[in-house]
Swiss-Prot record:
Keywords, ordered alphabetically: DNA-binding, Repressor, Transcription, Transcription regulation
Pfam family, one: TetR_N
Any one GO molecular function term: transcription cis-regulatory region binding
One annotated GO biological process: negative regulation of DNA-templated transcription
Organism: Escherichia coli (strain K12)
Matches recorded under Gene3D superfamilies: Homeodomain-like (1.10.10.60), Tetracycline Repressor, domain 2 (1.10.357.10)
Residue ranges for the DNA-binding region feature of this UniProt entry: 38-57
InterPro entries given in the database record: DNA-bd_HTH_TetR-type_CS, Homeodomain-like_sf, HTH_TetR, Tet_transcr_reg_TetR-rel_C_sf
Protein name: HTH-type transcriptional repressor BdcR
Residues in HTH tetR-type domain copies: 15-75
Entry keyword DNA-binding: yes
Annotated signal peptide: none
Length: 197
């Protein structure tokens, strides 16, 4: 008995949609981190071949850059909305930390902050991309504090960065939203004391 090998029906090749690839890759990079994800894993996950990836994004780091851009645009803490000049500085900074705790807590298998985790990448290009976003957020926080507390701006910004990095790390370790919010609240009290508000 001879069995016929089923051949694929000819037709148009599957279309590659870069925007859908970015959204899908965002989950992968967020769950595992840039360094832990191989090009083969990315292409398999996206259902494309390596040449398609390179044609669309140039490299894995190029894809990561686009992913971070989308992440910052859709999932980052809305600093511009929270850091308001009509409210006490300490109160707004506490809200930033609480929002970080909420956003960094486990969400569909993606915990922590992709930017904060990205700055630890061993790949120089990926790390530089993440550092740009990190510095932009730090500068926004620093400038906000400096408008009313110029002499405390650097130390409070450093403290905020340290606490947010810790919240991200603890979220990735599996800390609950309640634990993260409690830490954010304690850190917020310290900030209010430092600013004497």
């Amino acid at each position: 008995m001879v069995t016929k090998k089923q051949s694929r029906v000819p037709g148009r090749p599957r279309r590659f949609a870069p925007e859908q690839a970015i959204s899908a890759a965002k989950v992968l990079f967020h769950q595992k981190g840039f360094d832990a994800v191989s090009v083969a894993e990315v292409t398999d996950y996206l259902g494309i071949n390596p040449p398609s990836l390179y044609a669309a994004f140039g490299s894995k780091a190029g894809l990561f850059s686009r992913v971070l851009n989308e992440y910052v645009g859709t999932e980052a803490i809305p600093l511009a909305d929270i850091l308001r000049d009509d409210r006490p500085v300490g109160e707004c900074l506490v809200e930033v930390l609480k929002e970080a705790a909420r956003r960094y807590s486990q969400n569909g298998g993606c915990a922590g902050c992709m930017v904060l985790e990205g700055i630890h990448s061993h790949d120089p290009q990926a790390r530089d991309i993440a550092v740009q976003y990190y510095h932009a957020a730090e500068t926004t926080i620093y400038d906000y504090i400096a408008r009313r507390h110029p002499q405390r701006a650097q130390c409070v910004t450093d403290f905020m960065s340290t606490v947010m990095s810790g919240l991200s790390a603890k979220a990735r370790e599996g800390h609950s939203i309640e634990q993260l919010c409690a830490t954010a609240a304690m850190a917020g009290e310290a900030i209010k004391t430092i600013l004497e508000e």
